[in-house]
């Protein structure tokens, strides 16, 4: 299916003078896909700086929003937005993979719209102390919610083969084995505890592509970040949770920035709309027709306009897919996308340098 690039005029919807880091990607296209044309409840599963949430609230005076974020800093930062919209916004700290449970805790059984913006936020990247950036020195952390093992724990504690798999499958780093080997050799001398240490180490192994603006450490940092936060597993859980809470006619819009994220979303919508067979984890190996729980809103990925990528280069890899919930019951979770979100078994490793 051909990809659809948003028209150049879409950027006219952005607030005048807005900073790129505060403007959600594909905002006009997300709002069009959701079609907020009636009173109802919207769930923003990835609140961040509140860009999508504000737009949802401004779409209509009878739209209510529950906004979720696992990052307590983001939740604290949304207090002014809560006050500005007079009781129409509720902020909830938690993981969007549990959004059905989280909105039930808010005495809401179903939602009319769900939007998910997958991956790290610009705010997190820009704050050196969060440990996401290879361009600024800071502690090697990368935890979105502050809980669980940090990137430093993985880098200094995991076996070389596991590190290589993380870098290759989650970061798509072709020189994953060489990078993993260099990490293990370096940590024998001293622990790797800062982003600058790791970025310099990777840059010594991965040569920059001629003429490319991409830093040599980009893919390695991405792979570690995805592993630290279980981002792909969270995406799978979030898709299934959204499927459970959406009313018939409700819409789900998902923005991704990584090819594996997009593949998971594509397979989910393809299976749930009847375009592909569905395999359930409850009946492994059996593919059979299942109720069509979604119909496609976007026939292929919607890409940002050239104007948007000019203003916000971080948007260049973004893709939007959306679907509308049918009245069919939610089928069991899809085993195929759960597999995509996991590291392969050791014997599944392909040849890498």
UniProtKB/Swiss-Prot annotation:
It comes from the Bacteria. Signal peptide: none annotated. Its EC number is 2.1.1.199. The keyword Transferase applies. Transmembrane segments: none annotated. It is found in: Cytoplasm. Keywords: Cytoplasm, Methyltransferase, rRNA processing, S-adenosyl-L-methionine, Transferase. One of its GO terms (biological process) is rRNA base methylation. One of its GO terms (cellular component) is cytoplasm. One of its GO terms (molecular function) is rRNA (cytosine-N4-)-methyltransferase activity. Residues 276-353 are annotated as: Disordered. The keyword Lipoprotein does not apply. Belongs to the methyltransferase superfamily. RsmH family. Specifically methylates the N4 position of cytidine in position 1402 (C1402) of 16S rRNA. This is Ribosomal RNA small subunit methyltransferase H.
């Amino acid at each position: 299916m051909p990809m659809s690039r948003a028209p150049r005029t879409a950027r006219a919807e952005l607030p005048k003078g807005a900073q790129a880091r505060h403007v959600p990607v594909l905002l006009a296209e997300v709002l069009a896909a959701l079609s907020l044309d009636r009173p109802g409840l919207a769930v923003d599963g990835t609140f961040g700086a509140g860009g999508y949430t504000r737009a949802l609230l401004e779409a209509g005076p009878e739209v209510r929003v529950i906004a979720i974020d696992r990052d307590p800093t983001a939740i604290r930062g949304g207090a002014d937005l809560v006050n500005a919209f007079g009781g129409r916004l509720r902020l909830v700290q938690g993981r969007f993979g549990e959004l059905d449970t989280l909105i039930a805790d808010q005495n809401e059984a179903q939602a009319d719209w769900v939007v998910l913006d997958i991956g790290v936020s610009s705010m997190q990247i820009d704050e050196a102390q969060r440990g996401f950036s290879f361009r600024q020195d800071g502690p090697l952390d990368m935890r979105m919610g502050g809980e669980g093992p940090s990137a430093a724990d993985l880098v200094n504690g995991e076996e070389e083969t596991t590190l290589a798999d993380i870098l290759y499958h989650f970061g798509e780093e072709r020189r994953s084995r060489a990078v993993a080997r260099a990490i293990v050799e370096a940590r024998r001398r001293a622990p790797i505890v800062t982003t600058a240490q790791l970025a310099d180490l990777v840059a010594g192994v991965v040569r920059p592509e001629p003429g490319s603006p991409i830093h040599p450490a980009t893919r390695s940092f991405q792979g570690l970040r995805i592993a630290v936060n279980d981002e792909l597993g969270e995406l799978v859980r979030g898709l299934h949770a959204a499927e459970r809470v959406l009313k018939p006619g409700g819409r789900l819009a998902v923005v991704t920035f990584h090819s594996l994220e997009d593949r998971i979303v594509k397979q989910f919508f393809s299976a749930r709309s009847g375009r592909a067979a569905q395999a359930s984890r409850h009946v492994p190996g059996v593919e059979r027709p299942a109720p069509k729980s979604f119909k496609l809103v976007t026939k292929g990925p919607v890409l940002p306009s050239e104007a948007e990528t000019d203003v916000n280069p971080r948007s260049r890899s973004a893709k939007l897919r959306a679907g509308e919930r049918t009245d069919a019951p939610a089928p069991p979770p899809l085993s195929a996308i759960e597999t995509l979100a996991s590291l392969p078994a050791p014997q599944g490793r392909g040849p890498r340098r």
